[in-house]
């Protein structure tokens, strides 16, 4: 792939290397997908949720079909693309070189990263789906879990000794993993069932509960996006920023 993107990039920047071109393309795609994902996340939370409360039942099918469903399709696929390109860039150009310089394997860093952040999501999934708590309780639990996972990653990953690029994205990207799984594990499945049932004239009997669960997952993503964006910016602009005391 590096040779291909190098040729393409040479049309614009003749002196760019294959490695530099790959970095550029991955970050570019990651940013474009991320803007789409977070933009739609803010649309759903700040505009769509209050709007849908004012819509009468007869208007919902058309809104679901021509607005909500297409928006959710862009939302879920842009979420996947954001994480895919971001993890590719992080692993190939940050984790791998740092691991090589320190003489350690990068597998342990990825293993710890996935174990921690998928573990955080699994706990939140059970709480949202089985308990469906108040937003304040869920927010407190989320804050504790995220802080704990971030602290463990920063203090126990074998890489990240050169600067905080690996660590900052390891924390911010970890929140992105939680958000991605919320999208594909709760928000999309619940909304899909509600929308398809409504369009068929037979909405699910537990539609209100499913909507509440999707709302809690979406609102969790909304608040997680704030520190996520901070850590992503810090990784690029403040590579020496102290994170969790390191």
Which residues fall in each region the model found?
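Polytopic transmembrane helical bundles with strong interfacial aromatic enrichment
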Residues: 2-246
């Amino acid at each position: 792939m590096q040779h291909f993107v190098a040729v393409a990039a040479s049309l614009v920047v003749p002196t760019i290397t294959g490695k530099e071109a790959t970095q550029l393309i991955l970050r570019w795609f990651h940013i474009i997908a991320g803007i789409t994902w977070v933009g739609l996340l803010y649309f759903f939370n700040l505009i769509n949720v209050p709007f849908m409360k004012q819509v009468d039942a007869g208007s919902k099918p058309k809104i679901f079909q021509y607005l909500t469903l297409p928006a959710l399709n862009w939302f879920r696929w842009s979420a996947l693309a954001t994480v895919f390109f971001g993890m590719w860039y992080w692993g190939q150009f940050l984790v791998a070189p740092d691991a090589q310089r320190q003489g350690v394997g990068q597998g342990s860093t990825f293993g710890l990263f996935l174990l921690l952040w998928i573990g955080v999501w699994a706990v939140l999934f059970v709480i949202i789906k089985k308990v469906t708590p108040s937003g304040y309780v869920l927010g407190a639990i989320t804050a504790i879990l995220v802080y704990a996972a971030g602290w463990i990653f920063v203090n126990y990953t074998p890489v990240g000794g050169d600067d905080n690029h690996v660590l900052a994205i390891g924390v911010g990207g970890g929140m992105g993993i939680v958000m991605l799984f919320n999208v594909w594990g709760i928000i999309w499945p619940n909304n899909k069932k509600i929308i398809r049932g409504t369009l068929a004239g037979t909405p699910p009997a537990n539609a209100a509960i499913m909507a509440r669960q999707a709302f809690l997952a979406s609102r969790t993503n909304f608040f997680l996006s704030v520190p996520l964006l901070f850590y992503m910016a810090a990784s690029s602009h403040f590579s020496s920023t102290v994170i969790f005391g390191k």
